[in-house]
UniProtKB/Swiss-Prot annotation:
<dbReference type="Pfam" id="PF00149">
    <property type="entry name" value="Metallophos"/>
</dbReference>
<dbReference type="GO" id="GO:0008803">
    <property type="term" value="F:bis(5'-nucleosyl)-tetraphosphatase (symmetrical) activity"/>
</dbReference>
<dbReference type="InterPro" id="IPR004843">
    <property type="entry name" value="Calcineurin-like_PHP_ApaH"/>
</dbReference>
<comment type="function">
    <text>Hydrolyzes diadenosine 5',5'''-P1,P4-tetraphosphate to yield ADP.</text>
</comment>
<protein>
    <recommendedName>
        <fullName>Bis(5'-nucleosyl)-tetraphosphatase, symmetrical</fullName>
        <ecNumber>3.6.1.41</ecNumber>
    </recommendedName>
</protein>
<comment type="similarity">
    <text>Belongs to the Ap4A hydrolase family.</text>
</comment>
<keyword id="KW-0378">Hydrolase</keyword>
<dbReference type="InterPro" id="IPR029052">
    <property type="entry name" value="Metallo-depent_PP-like"/>
</dbReference>
<dbReference type="InterPro" id="IPR004617">
    <property type="entry name" value="ApaH"/>
</dbReference>
Length: 275
């Protein structure tokens, strides 16, 4: 049995299949995890969603910002962007079934046995693991059983910028969504910044990557995430695994075999997105 993690798919189905062939992935005995953003930009979002869904318990994804935006589009809250290449997905006969399945996916997977935490973008510098898990469960409960349409409608805001245990209602849910699916840079006081999308070496000096903030969790927890394609080839601490390497932008897709921490890469078949 092997455990694998794959960075953001963004509809790049062919590259995923090539990677899985290389490592001889066996859904009968292996487990495959995804960092979210299964869809958008690449040409085979429908195939990616169907594949992950049909793997059943052999696969697990977390929700990314593009996945949540897809849900907002599916329920008529937002309009689909042409550049996201989602025409085939929206026309699929199993579209509603796929959206129901996607809405059930978590924001955080924490595994004590294999000693890892999986998220799309990151974990708040103000959270310990118990708080991170609690905040993830709060959002997931609304998406799965609550007034998810209202949540999807109100999630498009970068406020609040800073965590407080006193946060309630939509502000608390929105902060959690932004941390788990959108965060990249933070200030020294742990305020979130959503304006800067530059590579680390070009970012303003007052900003730091979320995992460089002062939080004991970031020194002890193995955290696996995607989302940040411009981190490609940038060094991170040994327990921090950034797996989005920009396949949809013409770079490559990355797979991590957890058993021996070996990295496998597959070059993009073609560039389909705009970075």
């Amino acid at each position: 049995m092997s455990t694998y993690f794959v960075g953001d798919l963004h509809g790049c189905f062919d590259e995923l299949q090539k990677l899985l062939e290389r490592v001889r992935f066996d859904p009968v005995k292996d487990k495959l995890y995804f960092t979210g953003d299964l869809i958008a930009r690449g040409e085979k979002s429908l195939e990616c969603l169907r594949f992950v869904k049909n793997l059943g318990t052999s696969a697990q994804t977390v929700l990314g910002n593009h996945d949540l935006h897809l849900l907002a589009c599916a329920y008529g809250i937002k309009k689909v962007k042409t550049r996201d290449n989602l025409t085939a997905l929206f026309a699929a006969p199993d579209f509603d079934e796929l959206m129901d399945w996607l809405r059930q996916q978590p924001l955080l997977v924490h595994n004590d046995h294999f000693n890892f935490s999986l998220v799309h973008a990151g974990i708040s510098p103000d959270w310990d693991m118990a708080t991170a898990q609690a905040c993830a469960r709060e959002v997931e409960a609304v998406l799965r059983q609550g007034d998810y349409r209202a949540l999807l409608r109100q999630m498009y805001d970068s406020r609040p910028e800073r965590w407080s245990s006193d946060l309630q209602g939509i502000e608390r849910l929105r902060y959690s969504i932004n941390v788990f699916t959108r965060m990249r840079f933070c200030y020294a006081d742990h305020r979130l910044d959503f304006d800067c999308k530059l590579p680390l070496e070009q970012a303003p000096s007052e900003l730091m990557p979320w995992f460089a903030c002062d939080n004991p969790l970031f020194k002890t927890e193995n955290i696996i995430f995607g989302h940040w394609a411009s981190l490609v080839d940038c060094p991170t601490p040994g327990n921090i695994y950034a797996l989005d390497t920009g396949c949809a932008w013409g770079n490559r897709m990355t797979l991590l075999r957890w058993d021996d921490k070996r990295i496998f890469s597959q070059s993009a078949v073609k560039k389909t997105g705009v970075f």
